Amino acid sequence: MRHVRLPSRPLHHGLRATLAALAVATFGLTGLVGLQPARAAEPAGVPDTIEQRVAACIACHGRQGSTGNAAFFPRLAGKPAGYLFNQLRSFRDGRRSNTDMNYMVRHMSDAYLQEIADYFAGLDLPYAAVSPTSDAPPAQLARGRQLALEGDATRNIPACVHCHGAALTGVQPAIPGLLGLPRLYVSSQLGAWLTNERHALAPDCMAEIGRRMTTADINAVASWLAVQPMPANPKPVSAPAAPLPMACGGMQ
């Protein structure tokens, strides 16, 4: 292998020049130390509060868990704590499927999930204004109203109000309100029960109801619910007005 001899003088000269430059720079910087402004204080650490820890939820569910009707993601603020806790556990344990939710809660303990549920349940925030108009056909809205307020005895479908409260704002401790939710969210969840893609604690009453509904029924009730105004008091009622029409594992 041929050896190539590198010239020595330019290297030595370059090295001396580099060292000289470093010396000048070092001396110059040393002389300027006293003229530098005081170093800014280190920023405070991220506060370890529940508000900070649930910040990731806001990216999808909106400010403090309050979304508008145009969004796909459901509102969290003011929902019954028992309901939120059950849903978080279902995402963690695989009964509900959503890639982001499954990933975020997969290592969380029951105690931590309960803390998150309690936080969002305790938020008292106004609901976004609901547009009273719908592009759904009148017959579809009429069918949705029937299912929500009366049910369909011929198919053994109980009315939504029998479980979710007369005002459809939910019932403590674990039944959610159905108003103020995006139409697409409601229809997608009912559709997931219809196709056996969403599950809850046994006995899974909503899975039974979902399987008794047609896709037309699902679209009808979701469309009707989406345009209903919020009542003066949008909070969940303290207890059911009458015994539930069927057993639900989420209430145990």
Regions found by a protein language model. Give the residues of each.
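N-terminal secretory signal peptides that target proteins for export/translocation
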Residues: 1-15
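Bacterial N-terminal signal peptides
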Residues: 18-34
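Flexible coil segments in periplasmic/lumen-exposed cytochrome c-class electron-transfer proteins
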Residues: 41-54, 63-66, 99-169, 195-252
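The feature marks the first
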Residues: 45-94, 98
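Tandem-repeat/low-complexity and Cys-motif detector
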Residues: 74-77, 106-107, 177-178, 212
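Extended intrinsically disordered, low-complexity coil regions enriched in Ser, Thr, Gly, Ala
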Residues: 80-102, 180-204, 239
